[in-house]
Amino acid sequence: MTRPRPLTAAGLLVAAALVVATVLLAGMAAVGTGRAGDPGGAGAARSAPAYTPSAAGTLRGLAPAGTLIGTAVDPRGLNLDPAYPGVLAAEFNAVTAENAMKWRNLEPSPGVYAWAGGDQIVDLAHRNGQAVYGHTLVWHNDVPDWVSPDWPAQRLREVLRRHVTAVVAHYRGRVWAWDVVNEVLAEDGSLRDTLWLRKLGPGYVADAFRWARQADPDARLFINEYGTEGRTAKADALLDLVRRLRADGVPVDGVGFQGHLDAERPPEDVRGNLRRFAALGVRVAVTELDVRVRLPATAEVLRRQAAVYREVLRACLDVAACASVTVWGFTDARSWIPGYHRGFGAACLFDADFRPKPAHAALLDELVARRRTGG
């Protein structure tokens, strides 16, 4: 299959080698004033030990040619955590803006765009030889306060069209794929009751894809959803929606499966689920992977977490149409999980002091095993 642009596989490998060499030479001496273990809520600067890549290698260095292993990026980490940029550059060959490209952050007032946060991430990614996945264009959350539900449908549609067009055009040629619509399904598989559905009708989904295609014909366009990683009723509904959209000529190029998982309740048959979507002729991607555990995180709990991470990566690698696996942040220092799932945390590959956890080792082991077997 054709893989993400604009970076070639060879270019990614060269960039990976250069980045890892730079990190090793620099030693990543880290200084700071933050409190270790703070999940990033205060936004304070942090201290952490020096980062040294595993003797086995790095995720990006071991990834099969053409496969992206990415992470969501938090600008607070870039700006406040001395160890963060080095781990980001050495371990991952793709990035997603965690929040910087969401509408509320990009357009705080009508027609006034705040590109700095997104531009910082894109510029850094290209210096690091990393592909960029855009997130997200149309969502029911993070809509600016100035967008009024009282507007007539025609005005609301035009504002949404202008938003999608402006953002995709701004990053044209620098973002390989976009989450065009995000979380459009309710738990029962029907279209979610949102401002967009109530005012514009179900056609807003197709409209968003067509606007994005016009703004950047080369970007790959994804629909992104949670609770659909395994064979669930919601996944069945998503499969049917994608099939209908493509039958109507809507340019849906890919399906993103978020992957916010619980270590004690992993999804069933991720591999088979990815394959049935791929059979529609679309790419598939794991877009927001984290595996939360109930605290305290014992050694046994972290072992189970590692097994879930490895199984998701294995499922993607077994499906030719799977373009990427992206973790939703790589350090517990900046994870969103504790703020939204009470009693849970430790969801990432690195702990709050940027030390790799068993889950990171499990992913490396899977990649090394693939290299040995040629799989």
What are these regions (language model features)?
Residues P53-G61, E107, D145, P149, ...:
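Aromatic-rich peripheral "rim/lid" segments of glycoside hydrolase catalytic domains that contact
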Residues M1-A16:
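N-terminal export and membrane-targeting signals
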Residues A90-N99, N182, A215-E225, L238-R265, ...:
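Aromatic- and acid-rich polysaccharide-binding/catalytic face
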Residues P49-E98:
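Boundary/entry segment of secreted carbohydrate-active catalytic domains
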Residues L13, V23-G61, A65, A369-G375:
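N-terminal low-complexity, Pro/Thr-rich disordered segments
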Residues T52, A90, A94-P108, G117-G230:
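Substrate-binding cleft and catalytic face of glycoside hydrolase catalytic domains
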Residues P75-E91, R157-V167, A233-L245, V308-L313:
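Short, acidic/polar
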Residues Y51, A72-A83, W103-A116, L185-G189, ...:
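Acidic-and-aromatic substrate-binding clefts and catalytic sites of carbohydrate-active enzymes
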